[in-house]
């Protein structure tokens, strides 16, 4: 009888989905702030933007489909802000996002975080060591 221990996992997250009402606007926003290329895919019932996943442990997807509603409430995901999240944070407002919490030191001094609303109204965090 094989048991599954979560302590054996390399990451507790495998996929995250960010809801969008306008897939092109959302893809443009994340491409601009993260300086990445997001692959767009369209299906009859949904549109997707897939974050680069090669070499990543986690897959990120922007989703426009029934049942996907952008929200500033609920779970907050924190994107990797690289060495210094301020570089990404400086691009937020120029790309129709809104900074909610500026770069701040974590209470336990384990690094820095910031929180913003994306182009769709989702609350998203950034985290970095510096």
Where in this protein do the model-derived segments appear?
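Vicinal oxygen chelate
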Residues: 13-21, 67-93, 112-117
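Short acidic/glycine-enriched loop/turn segments that link adjacent beta-strands
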Residues: 43-47, 107-112
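N-terminal beta-strand motif that seeds the catalytic metal site of vicinal oxygen chelate
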Residues: 1-27, 75-77, 130
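Short beta->alpha transition motifs characteristic of CBS
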Residues: 16, 107, 115, 127-130
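Active-site beta-strand termini and strand-to-loop segments that position acidic
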Residues: 51-55, 116-119, 129
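Core segments of cupin and vicinal oxygen chelate
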Residues: 10, 17-58
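Conserved active-site tyrosine of GNAT-family acetyltransferases
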Residues: 26-30, 92, 121
């Amino acid at each position: 009888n094989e048991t599954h221990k979560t302590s054996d996992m390399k990451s507790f997250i495998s996929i995250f989905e960010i809801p969008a009402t306008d897939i092109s606007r959302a893809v443009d926003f994340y491409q601009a702030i993260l300086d990445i290329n997001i692959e767009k895919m369209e299906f009859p019932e949904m549109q997707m933007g897939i974050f680069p996943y090669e070499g990543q442990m986690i897959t990120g997807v922007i989703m426009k489909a029934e049942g996907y509603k952008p929200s500033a409430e609920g779970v907050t995901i924190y994107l990797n802000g690289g060495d210094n999240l301020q570089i990404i944070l400086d691009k937020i407002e120029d790309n129709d996002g809104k900074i909610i919490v500026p770069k701040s030191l974590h209470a336990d001094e384990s690094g820095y975080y910031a929180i913003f609303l994306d182009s769709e109204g989702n609350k998203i965090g950034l985290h970095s060591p510096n």
